[in-house]
C-alpha cells in the first residue's frame, strides 16, 4: 500500500511540476510561445527578458507554488503510514523529498510541452520552502545577491541552490536537522547545475547574457 502511495506521490508531483506557467502566462498575455524567444526555456528569467518584470514575478511565484504543493501533497497522502525500515517521520520526509524532486523534474521536462521546460530553480526553492524554510530563505538571499551583483541570472541561480545546500551541512551534522533535507538539496542542486551547463560555458567564455538583456 505504501509503495502505491509513493508512486501516486511521484506521478502527481511530476504532473504538478509539468504545468508550464511560463508558457501559459506568455501565451495568454502576449499570444506568444515563450520557447521561441531567448533561451527557449519557460522559466521566469526568459519571461523577464521577453515580457517584463510583472509577468516574470507571476511565473516565478507560480513555479514556487508547484514545489510547495508537491511536498504538501506528499505529506497528506502518506499520512501516518510508516516505512517498514524506518519510522513514520522517515516515511513522510522520504515521500516529500521524492515529491519535490519529481516536481523539479516535471518543470524541467514537462510532459505537456514535449519535455521542454525551464531549469527548475523556482520549483526547487518551492520544495525547499516546504521542507526547510530557513535553508530556502538563505539560498534565496544568495540567489538575489549573486544575480544582483554579477548581473547574471544563471550565476545567481547556481550560487543560490548551492547556498541552500551549504547551509544544510552544519544544520544537518551539527544541529541535527533531518538528513532528508540535505539529500533533497544535493540532488536538486546537482540537477539544476547540470541544467545550467551551457550557461556555465558561456560564463567562462565571457559570452553569457546579462539579466537585463532583452530576448529576441
From Swiss-Prot:
Q: Is Ribonucleoprotein among the key words of this record?
A: no
EC number(s) given by UniProt: 2.3.1.275
Q: Where are the transmembrane segments?
A: 6-26, 58-78, 92-112, 125-145, 158-178
Q: Tell me yes or no: is Cell membrane among this UniProt entry's keywords.
A: yes
Enumerate the UniProt keywords alphabetically: Cell membrane, Lipid biosynthesis, Lipid metabolism, Membrane, Phospholipid biosynthesis, Phospholipid metabolism, Transferase, Transmembrane, Transmembrane helix
Enzymatic reactions: an acyl phosphate + sn-glycerol 3-phosphate = a 1-acyl-sn-glycero-3-phosphate + phosphate
Q: In which pathway does it act?
A: Lipid metabolism; phospholipid metabolism
Report any one BP term from Gene Ontology: phospholipid biosynthetic process
> Which GO terms label this protein's molecular function in UniProt?
acyl-phosphate glycerol-3-phosphate acyltransferase activity
Localization per record = Cell membrane
Give the enzyme's main class according to its UniProt record, as a single word: transferase
Any one GO CC term of this protein is: plasma membrane
The way this protein sits in the membrane is described as: Multi-pass membrane protein
The UniProt entry's sequence similarity note says: Belongs to the PlsY family.
Quaternary arrangement and interactors, per the entry? Answer: Probably interacts with PlsX.
What does this gene product do? Catalyzes the transfer of an acyl group from acyl-phosphate (acyl-PO(4)) to glycerol-3-phosphate (G3P) to form lysophosphatidic acid (LPA). This enzyme utilizes acyl-phosphate as fatty acyl donor, but not acyl-CoA or acyl-ACP.
Q: What is this protein called?
A: Glycerol-3-phosphate acyltransferase 3
Give the species this sequence originates from.
Dehalococcoides mccartyi (strain ATCC BAA-2266 / KCTC 15142 / 195)
